[in-house]
């Protein structure tokens, strides 16, 4: 067996073995693992002399591990494994032995020993710790003579802790109970001896292997969370910790001495982090003399020499962690209302001592160090906020904390002196800095809630002071100072325009708003817009857009700010240029009513940017680039579209005459028409770049249309665009249709045309209807995908809604072609998940389109002479969807369509509160459809039974229940509109299904009650769901 196991391991890990042979070997080893039967052979392999290779020993020990942990071996077998492995350890790790295991074999061995410990320590191996301690030697030899066995001893201690006390590992209740019992046994029997061994190792730390010292400290750090602190907190141990933590002159933080120093400080952190009573925690911090310890560490050369090669950021992060833990605990004590006065006073004293330390690390040049103390600074500020809310003010001893904290936050908000904004390869650093800024902003917001007036005063001083310095030519200012002022000014808006706009009745709406207005004036006066750094330029534009209301109240400043924006739209910096196009559109959209006589000048100033030059995508471009960093040709064109929308907004301003609106439209679109005409022949011949150029032109025309009109399709037609302007966009629509007809097989052209069509609605008004058949023919071609048809149906529904009073005749003409294209797509068999999703979406959009037609009083189109041939297909498709058990949302929607048809075509209610009343809504004022009541009884009423009878229908499923609720609503609508004939049909159906006479009466009575009000209607729905459930259960 031994040879078989060894051979299998060799084959499994030999890369030269054939795949088939390796597969067989792996399968054999997995079988041994699952059976747990090869542990004897594996144990023998591991301990064999001469030793096999490490991979064989490691895998063999893993098989032993598996048997110990998973197969519940009897105690005799476990004892045999224990004795065999301990014998191996004694031989291999004896002083002077040259056969010690490699590091990864040691770790595996200690894992096995830990599993054996968990199984045997409570019963038959109480000497577990003593056995390993004996290997490490007595007080004289532990650590500095028997180094290998001391390492092994500490490894064992670490493994035991990780197995039974690691809080980060999720465990079952059974494991938790076992671990609690084991920890109790260790605390009762061995922990004092273990603590003594730590003391013995550390007592001679200066002459001991420093890696061993570090490991000992890390081990103590693990154990302090669940042992009595007095075992490690005594004067000798604390003196040793302080000696290690206070080492000076360490040039390399990664050296053994540096690691020991950091481990000692981490041990302090773990000790401080131990849960205990508030008074005991304060006593502990003072006993450890941590105020002086931290103070000395901060003034040591390794932390005092900022911006020098000697600065040790690893040490800074380690001490910051200690400070963070101390402040966290002290704040928790201060928040505790049950703390005695002496403890509270001591905690107050500690906060005063540690706040400067906290701010020292918060302001550290390294963001990693700063981030380490943000949690405790957050806790401190949260405590002050609660105190302010509770007492109405912050006590003086705490109020003094706020100024240095806010100053430190603002300082950390500033770009580092070494930062190179926008440079290649800086994206990761930039992302990390912005993440830090977001965290700092949260702290700043907390300070605002504690002392709003101080925050306003501080930020105003910073921003106005910076802009004043710029105005006066202060040479010490750089882009980082200006960007910080603008960034803080941007954030300031959260307070200044929190509850309302910047102005109320032409006056600043709050004190903060008043200060923000002052900042805006300072910014404008400083000439900051001309500062050449891209980060400043971007923030300037963001500020102008965010606070556009300032310009509404100061219209004399609008020409200048627009001039600045126009300059920035021509920036040579690609990020500034592309972002400015978007922000320019945002600004002019807000200010279009105040543009006045400058409209033409602005359009002329950006006209050179409206030239479209399509570029085929470069396959080497990084497809994973973020939207902000994307500088591809496609991304730049998408930004360019904002310019077209912007000039549309400018050209259609209320301050522009109708004559000029038409002129501007001609000026902007004429070059596009010429380009389209010249490029179309090349695109017809299959030129990909020409096709992309046509796509871009169509998108630009659609986007211009969106900018050109404020009109939102609704029942109000008062804002329909001026006819002269509409004439120009009719030409645009015709040009797009020519391109669409020529390039109909191109999905990108269809996409662009669909995009433009939906945006032409607002500028063409009802003129669009004359072209609707051509649009439908182009956009619902045989090449169109299901996704395209779904999207177009949404737009067509919008057209129907918008022009319901004028569209009837045209809709009657186009309905059958539209339905035929839909039916053709619905009949497609999906070939994958994406197709299934698109098909489900198409079904829903088709049903929604029918609902729009019915709701807008256009139901007669569906049954007209022109479209009557499609009516049966419509009804059949709806019935099929209603019975589809795999798509409950669509099934519910399908039933709802049937309910709308009944409501529209069956005339007035026959029974219920609305019986014989004259209908008033557009949907129900349509003429009843002769004979439709009988059709409903024959065709729709059976669905109540055929839906739950459909294969796969599960009445217990939540979504299926919702379908049944809709089926109940269908029956309510039928009985309301048809009356007695339907009731008789129901009785017949129920009796035919084996329902007793009293059951039939109850069913009919409950259904009739649904017409009496909301409560009864709900009772009927619940009754029907339960009725179907009982019926299906009976059949089962």
Swiss-Prot record:
<keyword id="KW-0819">tRNA processing</keyword>
<dbReference type="InterPro" id="IPR045546">
    <property type="entry name" value="Exportin-T_C"/>
</dbReference>
<keyword id="KW-0820">tRNA-binding</keyword>
<comment type="similarity">
    <text>Belongs to the exportin family.</text>
</comment>
<dbReference type="GO" id="GO:0016363">
    <property type="term" value="C:nuclear matrix"/>
</dbReference>
<protein>
    <recommendedName>
        <fullName>Exportin-T</fullName>
    </recommendedName>
</protein>
<keyword id="KW-0539">Nucleus</keyword>
<dbReference type="GO" id="GO:0000049">
    <property type="term" value="F:tRNA binding"/>
</dbReference>
<dbReference type="InterPro" id="IPR016024">
    <property type="entry name" value="ARM-type_fold"/>
</dbReference>
<keyword id="KW-0963">Cytoplasm</keyword>
<dbReference type="GO" id="GO:0005643">
    <property type="term" value="C:nuclear pore"/>
</dbReference>
<dbReference type="GO" id="GO:0071528">
    <property type="term" value="P:tRNA re-export from nucleus"/>
</dbReference>
<dbReference type="GO" id="GO:0008033">
    <property type="term" value="P:tRNA processing"/>
</dbReference>
<dbReference type="Pfam" id="PF19282">
    <property type="entry name" value="Exportin-T"/>
</dbReference>
<keyword id="KW-0694">RNA-binding</keyword>
<dbReference type="InterPro" id="IPR040017">
    <property type="entry name" value="XPOT"/>
</dbReference>
<keyword id="KW-0813">Transport</keyword>
<dbReference type="Pfam" id="PF08389">
    <property type="entry name" value="Xpo1"/>
</dbReference>
<dbReference type="InterPro" id="IPR011989">
    <property type="entry name" value="ARM-like"/>
</dbReference>
<dbReference type="InterPro" id="IPR013598">
    <property type="entry name" value="Exportin-1/Importin-b-like"/>
</dbReference>
<comment type="function">
    <text>tRNA nucleus export receptor which facilitates tRNA translocation across the nuclear pore complex. Involved in pre-tRNA splicing, probably by affecting the interaction of pre-tRNA with splicing endonuclease.</text>
</comment>
<dbReference type="GO" id="GO:0031267">
    <property type="term" value="F:small GTPase binding"/>
</dbReference>
<dbReference type="GO" id="GO:0005737">
    <property type="term" value="C:cytoplasm"/>
</dbReference>
């Amino acid at each position: 067996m031994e040879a078989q196991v060894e051979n299998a391991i060799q084959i499994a890990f030999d890369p030269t073995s054939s795949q088939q042979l390796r597969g067989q070997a792996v399968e054999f080893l997995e079988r041994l693992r699952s059976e747990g039967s090869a542990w004897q052979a594996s144990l023998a392999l591991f301990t064999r002399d001469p030793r096999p290779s490490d991979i064989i020993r490691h895998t063999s020990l893993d098989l032993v591990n598996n048997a110990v942990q998973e197969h519940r071996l009897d105690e005799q077998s476990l004892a045999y494994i224990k004795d065999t492995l301990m014998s191996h350890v004694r031989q291999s790790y004896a002083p002077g032995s040259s056969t010690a295991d490699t590091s990864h074999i040691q770790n595996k061995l200690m894992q096995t020993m830990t599993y054996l410990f968990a199984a045997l320590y409570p019963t038959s191996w109480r000497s577990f710790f003593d056995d390993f301690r004996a290997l490490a030697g007595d007080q004289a030899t532990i650590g500095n003579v028997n180094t290998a066995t001391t390492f092994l001893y500490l490894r064992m201690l670490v493994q035991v802790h990780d197995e039974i006390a690691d809080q980060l590992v999720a465990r079952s209740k059974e494991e938790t109970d076992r671990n609690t019992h084991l920890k109790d046994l260790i605390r009762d029997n061995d922990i004092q001896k273990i603590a003594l061994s730590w003391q013995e190792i550390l007592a001679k730390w200066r002459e001991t292997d420093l890696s061993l010292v570090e490991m000992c400290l890390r081990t103590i750090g693990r154990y302090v969370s669940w042992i009595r602190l007095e075992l490690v907190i005594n004067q000798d141990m604390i003196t040793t910790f302080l000696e290690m933590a206070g080492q000076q002159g360490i040039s390399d933080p990664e050296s053994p001495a540096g690691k020991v120093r950091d481990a000692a400080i981490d041990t302090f952190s773990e000790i401080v982090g131990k849960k205990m009573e508030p008074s005991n925690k304060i006593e502990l911090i003072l006993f450890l003399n941590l105020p002086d310890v931290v103070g000395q560490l901060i003034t040591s050369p390794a932390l005092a020499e900022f911006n020098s090669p000697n600065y040790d950021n690893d040490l800074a992060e380690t001490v910051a962690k200690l400070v963070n833990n101390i402040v966290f605990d002290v704040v928790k004590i201060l928040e505790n209302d049950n703390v005695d006065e002496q403890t509270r006073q001591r905690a107050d004293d500690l906060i005063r001592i540690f706040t400067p330390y906290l701010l020292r690390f918060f302001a550290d040049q390294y963001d990693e160090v700063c981030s380490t103390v943000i949690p405790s600074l957050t806790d401190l500020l949260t405590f002050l906020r609660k105190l302010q809310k509770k007492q109405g003010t912050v006590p003086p001893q705490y109020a003094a904390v706020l100024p240095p904290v806010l100053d430190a936050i603002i300082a950390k908000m500033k770009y580092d002196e070494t930062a190179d904004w926008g440079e290649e390869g800086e994206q990761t650093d930039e992302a990390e800095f912005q993440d830090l800024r977001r965290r700092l902003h949260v702290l700043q917001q907390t300070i605002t809630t504690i002392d709003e007036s101080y925050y306003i005063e501080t930020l105003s001083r910073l921003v106005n002071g910076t802009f004043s310095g710029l105005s006066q030519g202060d040479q010490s200012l750089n882009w980082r100072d200006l960007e910080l002022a603008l960034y803080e000014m941007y954030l300031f808006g959260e307070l200044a325009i929190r509850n309302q706009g910047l102005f109320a009745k032409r006056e600043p709406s709050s004190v903060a708003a008043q200060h923000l207005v002052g900042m805006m004036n300072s910014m404008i006066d400083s000439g900051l817009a001309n500062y050449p750094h891209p980060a400043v330029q971007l923030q300037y534009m963001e500020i102008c857009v965010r606070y556009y209301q300032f310009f509404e109240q100061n219209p004399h400043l609008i020409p200048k700010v627009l001039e600045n924006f126009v300059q920035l739209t021509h920036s040579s910096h690609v990020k500034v240029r592309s972002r400015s196009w978007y922000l320019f559109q945002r600004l002019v959209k807000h200010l279009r009513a105040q543009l006045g006589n400058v409209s033409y000048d602005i359009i002329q100033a950006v006209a050179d940017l409206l030239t479209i030059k399509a570029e085929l995508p470069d396959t080497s471009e990084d497809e994973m680039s973020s939207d902000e960093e994307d500088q591809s040709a496609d991304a730049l064109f998408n930004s360019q579209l904002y310019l077209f929308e912007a000039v549309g907004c400018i050209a259609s301003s209320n301050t522009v005459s109708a004559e000029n609106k038409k002129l501007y439209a001609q000026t902007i679109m004429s070059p596009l028409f010429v380009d389209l005409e010249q490029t179309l022949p090349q695109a017809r011949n299959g030129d990909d770049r020409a096709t992309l150029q046509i796509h871009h032109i169509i998108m630009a025309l659609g986007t211009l249309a969106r900018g050109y009109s404020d009109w939102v399709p609704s029942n109000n037609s008062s804002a329909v665009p001026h006819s002269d302007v509409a004439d120009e966009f009719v030409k645009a629509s015709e040009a797009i249709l020519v391109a669409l007809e020529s390039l109909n097989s191109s999905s990108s052209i269809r996409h662009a045309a669909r995009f433009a069509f939906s945006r032409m609605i607002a500028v063409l008004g009802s003129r669009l209807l004359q072209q609707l058949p051509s649009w439908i023919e182009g956009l619902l071609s045989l090449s169109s995908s299901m996704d395209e048809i779904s999207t177009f149906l949404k737009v067509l529904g919008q057209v129907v809604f918008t022009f319901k009073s004028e569209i009837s005749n045209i809709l009657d003409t186009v309905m059958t072609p539209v339905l035929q294209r839909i039916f053709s797509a619905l009949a497609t068999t999906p070939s994958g998940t994406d197709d299934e999703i698109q098909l489900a979406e198409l079904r829903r959009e088709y049903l929604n389109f029918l609902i729009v037609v019915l709701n807008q009083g256009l139901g007669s189109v569906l049954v007209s002479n022109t479209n009557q041939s499609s009516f049966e297909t419509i009804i059949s498709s709806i019935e099929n969807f209603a019975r589809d058990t795999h798509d409950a949302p669509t099934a519910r929607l399908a039933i709802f369509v049937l309910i709308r048809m009944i409501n529209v075509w069956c005339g007035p209610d026959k029974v219920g509160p609305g019986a014989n009343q004259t209908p008033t809504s557009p949907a129900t004022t349509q003429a009843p459809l002769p004979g439709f009541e009988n059709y409903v009884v024959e065709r729709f009423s059976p669905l109540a039974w055929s839906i739950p009878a459909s294969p796969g229908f599960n009445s217990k499923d939540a979504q299926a229940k919702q379908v049944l609720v809709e089926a109940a609503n269908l029956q309510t609508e039928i009985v309301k509109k048809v009356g007695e004939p339907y009731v008789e049909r129901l009785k017949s159906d129920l009796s035919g299904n084996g329902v007793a006479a009293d059951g039939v009466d109850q069913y009919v009575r409950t259904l009739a009650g649904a017409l009496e009000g909301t409560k009864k209607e709900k009772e009927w729905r619940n009754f029907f769901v339960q009725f179907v459930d009982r019926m299906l259960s009976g059949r089962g």
